[in-house]
């Protein structure tokens, strides 16, 4: 055996049987946990990059740019659009190339939009089209979620998948609040003056260096890339062709569960992208950047809790109750907005925190539903055609990972639709109410869908 093969095999797990209790306790658990925590670190940074424009767009006009409100909302929405599209091919990558190698590549390329954005904001003559392109490149970070969640699903047994996926997705989602907490702080610090970065004077006498919000992530991404290269593993049994993963698209439940995930995760990422801009338009006297991080923080932690709670009480039950509360909070939001009166920022903020909480919790519970339902369907279908238990388990793992990737792609569309809907509604009517009415109707439809398809009986094996 060559030295190169020996080095490669250090990271390749050719024998991986997480459903075997003895194997799991003696060997599998430690390996799975190590891969999980490195994955969480990489995904957290990816979410920081993905939602970078939610903090940058609010400040662009303060440093010499002159973009309209609708243009700024568009910049916050575009990363979610490209991220959603890219999640489809990204969902194939782990079975094709291996989780370790793909995590390394997908993390290191995020340095490109961060570095470019840092240069772009230093020149007020930078065209809007350049910012649109950088925003679309930030979408590569959002696509990481599909491959990351699919990869982690290979490492854990069925009984622990809800918790593992909740931790990976929830703490990964925490990157949104980490970015929205750190960015408003670092843009007023002389971090990169040694590289010639100069802040733009503000009315209060401070210097705003928006470059810092982008460049601060570059060294962290480099460290995460090295951690993935030296600390993660590829699973030999996870290898699968694109053709072998496509049949999941024919299953009705993939599309039904996609709608539920669009309503939960799509809301979380959409509100994360657009909340600061929305609050600024409705309550311009409030410095929202000091408070914006708390909503994504609540939602990210709630996602982790959603997976754990669903493992205990059932994903369907948790998801159903959660959608009822999402509809309730959306209805209450109408009462907080400026209309004939000034509105109430305190009430607006508290109700929106409730929306972040339920969107995050529902993201975890719907992902648990997806993992459980697709595993059940695949096991049933393989055994129905006379396949062995080993074959059934192997196909169940591959199909579940493919389904998680496809559904996460559709869910990410909410990150584009929600801020764009707010921007369009404000441009047409001067109010976000029109967009909120659509959200309310969608949540109510999801209550009915969850109850009628999954709440009254087990899903049909199709």
Swiss-Prot record:
Stretches in topological domain Periplasmic: 57-71, 123-124, 202-206, 280-287, 339-341, 423-432
InterPro entries the record matches: MFS, MFS_trans_sf, NO3_transporter, NO3_transporter_NarK/NarU-like
Membrane topology classification: Multi-pass membrane protein
Compartments (UniProt record): Cell inner membrane
Gene Ontology CC annotations of this record: plasma membrane
UniProt cross-references to Pfam families, sorted A to Z: MFS_1
UniProt GO BP: nitrate assimilation
Topology, Cytoplasmic side: 1-35, 93-101, 146-180, 228-258, 309-317, 363-401, 454-462
Keywords: Cell inner membrane, Cell membrane, Membrane, Nitrate assimilation, Transmembrane, Transmembrane helix, Transport
GO terms for MF: nitrate transmembrane transporter activity; nitrite transmembrane transporter activity
Entry's transmembrane regions: 36-56, 72-92, 102-122, 125-145, 181-201, 207-227, 259-279, 288-308, 318-338, 342-362, 402-422, 433-453
Family, similarity comment: Belongs to the major facilitator superfamily. Nitrate/nitrite porter (TC 2.A.1.8) family.
Job of this protein: Catalyzes nitrate uptake, nitrite uptake and nitrite export across the cytoplasmic membrane.
Xref: PANTHER family: HIGH-AFFINITY NITRATE TRANSPORTER 2.3
Protein name: Nitrate/nitrite transporter NarU
Source organism of this protein record: Salmonella typhimurium (strain LT2 / SGSC1412 / ATCC 700720)
Gene: narU
């Amino acid at each position: 055996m060559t030295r190169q093969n020996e080095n490669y095999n250090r990271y390749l797990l050719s024998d991986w049987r997480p459903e075997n209790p003895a194997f799991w306790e003696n060997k599998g658990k430690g390996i799975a946990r190590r891969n999980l925590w490195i994955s969480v670190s990489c995904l957290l940074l990816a979410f920081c990059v993905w939602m970078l424009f939610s903090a940058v767009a609010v400040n662009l006009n303060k440093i010499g740019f002159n973009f309209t409100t609708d243009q700024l909302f568009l910049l916050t929405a575009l990363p979610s659009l490209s991220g959603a599209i890219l999640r489809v091919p990204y969902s194939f990558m782990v079975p094709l190339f291996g989780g370790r190698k793909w995590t390394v590549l997908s993390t290191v390329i995020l340095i490109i939009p961060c570095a470019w954005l840092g240069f772009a904001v230093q020149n007020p003559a930078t065209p809007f089209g350049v910012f649109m392109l950088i925003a679309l490149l930030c979408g590569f970070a959002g696509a990481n979620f599909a491959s990351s969640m699919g990869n982690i699903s290979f490492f854990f047994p069925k009984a622990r998948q809800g918790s593992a996926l909740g931790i990976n997705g929830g703490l990964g989602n925490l990157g949104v609040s980490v970015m929205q907490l750190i960015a408003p702080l670092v843009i007023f610090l002389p971090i990169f003056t040694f590289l010639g970065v100069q802040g733009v004077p503000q009315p209060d006498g401070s210097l705003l260096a928006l470059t810092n919000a982008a460049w601060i992530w570059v060294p962290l991404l480099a460290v995460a890339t090295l951690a993935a290269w030296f600390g993660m593993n590829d699973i030999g049994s996870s290898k699968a062709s694109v053709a072998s993963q496509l049949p999941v698209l024919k299953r009705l439940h993939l599309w039904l569960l996609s709608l539920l995930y669009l309503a939960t995760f799509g809301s979380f990422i959409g509100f994360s992208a657009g909340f600061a801009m929305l609050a600024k338009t409705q309550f311009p006297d409030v410095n929202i950047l000091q408070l914006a991080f708390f909503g994504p923080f609540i939602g990210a932690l709630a996602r982790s809790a959603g997976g754990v709670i669903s493992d205990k009480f059932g994903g369907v039950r948790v998801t159903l109750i959660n959608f009822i509360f999402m509809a309730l909070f959306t209805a209450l939001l109408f009462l907080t907005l400026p209309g004939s009166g000034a509105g109430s920022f305190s009430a607006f903020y508290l109700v929106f925190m409730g929306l972040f909480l339920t969107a995050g919790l529902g993201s975890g519970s719907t992902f648990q539903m997806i993992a459980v339902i697709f595993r059940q369907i695949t096991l049933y279908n393989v055994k129905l055609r006379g396949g062995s238990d080993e074959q059934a388990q192997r196909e169940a793992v591959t199909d579940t990972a493919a389904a998680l990737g496809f559904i996460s792609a559709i869910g990410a569309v909410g990150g584009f639709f929600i801020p764009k809907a707010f921007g369009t509604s404000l441009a047409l009517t001067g109010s976000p109410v029109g967009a909120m009415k659509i959200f309310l109707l969608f949540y109510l439809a999801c209550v009915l869908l969850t109850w009628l398809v999954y709440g009254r009986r087990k899903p049909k094996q199709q």
